[in-house]
Each structure stands twice: as C-alpha cells, then as structure tokens.
C-alpha cells in the first residue's frame, strides 16, 4: 500500500527471485526499511526459492513451504548467522530457484520408501554464481522433504561448533 502512493516507485524482479524497489527518496527508502524490518535476519534467511507448486503448474514440490519450514527450524535451533549459507530451492528441474548455483541447493523430486512415493528434494552442493568463479553444483542425493529442516539444523550446529563460518568450514571439509 505504501509504495502505491509513491509516484514512479517500481518493484523490479531479478533472475534470482529477489526484488528491488527503485525510484525512492532517502526518506521513502527509510520508510520501506521500517515496513520490511521483519524480513531476513541472517544470511541463511536471504535464501532463494522459486514460487513453487502451490502456484506454478510445472512445479513438482512446494519450494516456498520448504523454505519457510527450514527458516523456522533454523531460527528455533538458534543457529548463529554465518553457520549456514544462503540456499537455493527449485520446485522442479526448471531451476527458477537457481538450485545448481547455490552452495547448497535443492530441486523438487519424489522418493520411494517402502513402496510409497514421498515428497523429496535432490541435494546439490558447491555451486557458485560469483562472476569469474561460476560453477554448477554437484548432485549428491535425494532427501525426503520432511527431513531437510533437521538436516540443515544438524549441519548448522556442526559448523557453529567448529567456530568457523560455513565458507571456511566447507573449504576445510570438502567431503
């Protein structure tokens, strides 16, 4: 509502699913910051997710639901900022959430367990989208959707106990 009243204000969407608000004065920008103060509080909470299967007809999994459950689990576990990287989640192979270029990425899938098909995501690691260092992540395996928040909490606790941030820890523990 606030932006609707500002002449020439625009919201621009980027390829990584983030949004930029442009054509604001300094005071207007400060007001937008105030209105959005309940946003991301850590690097992990700036994670990227496509719109997901709840809206996208191509999407196999609800990537937004996964992201929200992961953020809640990491907040509840009080994982410190820097212990987990920004993750990228795509609900299908189309890669709208750029899962291959994240340090940790997930792509919507299904996994059969005891003859029953369950919602799952394929895990990718070590992708990079930094210009000059671009690389596609390595596909590691498939994790049930319900297990991903706990996987990230365990990883975050492990990294936090090392006293390092995720980047330093990952470089010291490449496997």
Language model segments and positions:
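Small-residue-enriched alpha-helical segments and adjacent helix-cap loops
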Residues: 1-115
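Long hydrophobic segments that form regular secondary structure
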Residues: 1-11, 151-154, 158-161, 165-175
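Residue-identity detector for threonine
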Residues: 25, 36, 46, 98-101, ...
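Noncatalytic linker/hinge segments flanking ATPase motor cores
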Residues: 28, 54-64, 126-135, 162-170
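Mobile "lid/hinge" segments at catalytic clefts and subdomain interfaces of large enzymes
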Residues: 105-164
